[in-house]
Amino acid sequence: MSTKKVKEAEAVSEEVTQQSKLAEAKRALSGVKMALKKKLGDDIFTEKVIGILPSISTGSALIDKEIGNNGLVLGRVHEIFGNTGSAKTTLATLTMINALKQYPDKFVLYMDFEQAFNLEYSRRLGLDPDDERFIFMQPSSIEDGFEIVDRMVSTGILSLVVMDSVPAMISRREMEADYDKETMAEKPRVLSRSIPKLLEPLKEANTALVFINQIRDKLSY
């Protein structure tokens, strides 16, 4: 047998071996899937999503292009961050305006932890503060804020939630105790507990959650 035919035979043999291994792997995967579906439910394996996902425009074509999907994807958590005075709240306001336009049957929830939201400035940008679909709240603590978000997201009536801002948030424990390293660490703990709990409800309700944050030179709140 010529060298060429030997190589062809080896290639065919290798392909057959690979196909056999793949078939074996598929059988193993099928068995695992059946067991997981039986224990965790059929929804544990979701369909692959290809293409543009439902989103909300930020009002900036450049930012939307960089993000992809024409803006902030519904059902996910996003963060707008930057230095002081870098138009973070302005960008969030433009996003709220577009959410009201793109999803007229849904509400937008804005949580003003800083207690500094300028209603007149937002009006000049094009947001109607008197629109009944625009919900404006000023929670006193992080825990109150997340409880509000959890309850309202579960209704399925929101397209967008904006929490402004992370540095201005304060936990109940911080409100009641003296400022020290232990109480300062309470905010990150509350955030790390609360955000994961919202991931599935946000996905089911098709609601985008936006946190506004600030770049700091020191790792403190």
Regions found by a protein language model. Name each.
Residues M1-V12:
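N-terminal acidic, proline/glycine-rich, low-complexity intrinsically disordered segments
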Residues T17-E132, I148-S154:
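The Walker A/P-loop phosphate-binding site
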Residues I56-S60, T89, I142, M184, ...:
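A conditional alpha-helix N-cap/helix-loop micro-motif detector
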Residues D105-F107, E132, I157-L160, E204-F211:
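Loop/turn-to-beta-strand initiation segments
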Residues Q115-A116, S140-G145, D217:
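Short acidic loop-to-helix transition motifs that present clustered carboxylates
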Residues D130-E143:
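A glycine-rich helix N-cap at a beta->alpha junction
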Residues G145-V161, L198-L199:
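Short amphipathic alpha-helices and their capping/turn segments at secondary-structure boundaries
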Residues L160-E204, F211-Y221:
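Conserved P-loop NTPase nucleotide-binding/switch module
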